[in-house]
Amino acid sequence: MRTIKIIQTASQLPEKIVSNDDLAGMMDTSDEWIRSRTGIFKRHIAVDETTASLAASVLQKLLKGSGISADQIDFVLVATMSPDSMAPSTAAQASALAGLSNAFAMDINVACSGFVYGLTLAHGLVNTLGSHYGVVIGAETLSKLVDWQERSTAVLFGDGAAGVLVEAVDGPERLLAADLKTFGKEAKSLTAGHLWSSTTWNQPEKGSRYFQMDGHAVYSFATRQVAASIKRTFEKISADIGDTDYFLLHQANQRIIDKVADLLKQPADRFLSNLSKYGNTSAASIPLLLDEMVTGNIVKSGQLLTLSGFGAGLSVGSIVYKY
């Protein structure tokens, strides 16, 4: 069986930066209130950028950085919960913008768990289809799903995109194990982007196109299920959780990251974070963190990484990867 090797990382952020003080001028909040409850200092917000254009920029950077040509790419997977349109897919639009002609492209919507699901699917694709090069991107413009008068959610989210270019290789396994799980009965704890027909008599609530979240329920789910998912993943391999060099969790809230570290009884400094600069970027958060840490020479070849995402669905997904 072949495995996937990450040979390039890349990211793209919108130009506009919105600080906590900027938000304090728009609603009843403060920099101190946001920092103390979330760990977020600022976020990037798309103005002229779209989900597809951000994803395309990442794709172009991946090609340039790796030296792989556009016609060598076999597949493009884009994890997003904030597409520009229902059809065509963000992956199809990004592929066209980046000049790809031979790749098949598809979107994945598992919200904040999407990048982990995408990497797991990529591992399967190289074996079932014989693909050689593929791209997995997380791209979001969550700002269009935010009610900018609702403090409990408006302070959390940011826009951005990041991803990886993977190569199918023989030899020692790199994606050592995965755990994916969805808890549909808890779906109402986090919703956004409701669509409805103009002929439907029972219209959704006015605000249902925007994020609606039961913060306490999501916090409880995330801390319990991320820790449980990581434990299940390690039960599948001959390694211990403590062998992890770095944990890259979905960047939703610093309190969640700290609590998971505590539940797993692992040192907090192994849990990498860039949440303060970007906020919750959903499917983009893990690859954005990975790219920053690879570029900064924090994550190096040969290290054992544990990636775990959680979010709407409610969903959770974890992988153990030998970088």
From Swiss-Prot:
Belongs to the thiolase-like superfamily. FabH family. The active site is at C112, H250, N280. It is an enzyme of class 2 (transferase). Its main location: cytoplasm. Gene3D superfamilies: 3.40.47.10. This is Beta-ketoacyl-[acyl-carrier-protein] synthase III. PANTHER family: 3-OXOACYL-[ACYL-CARRIER-PROTEIN] SYNTHASE, BETA-KETOACYL-[ACYL-CARRIER-PROTEIN] SYNTHASE III, CHLOROPLASTIC. Pfam families: ACP_syn_III, ACP_syn_III_C. Its EC number is 2.3.1.180. Pathway: Lipid metabolism; fatty acid biosynthesis. It catalyses: malonyl-[ACP] + acetyl-CoA + H(+) = 3-oxobutanoyl-[ACP] + CO2 + CoA. GO terms for cellular component: cytoplasm.
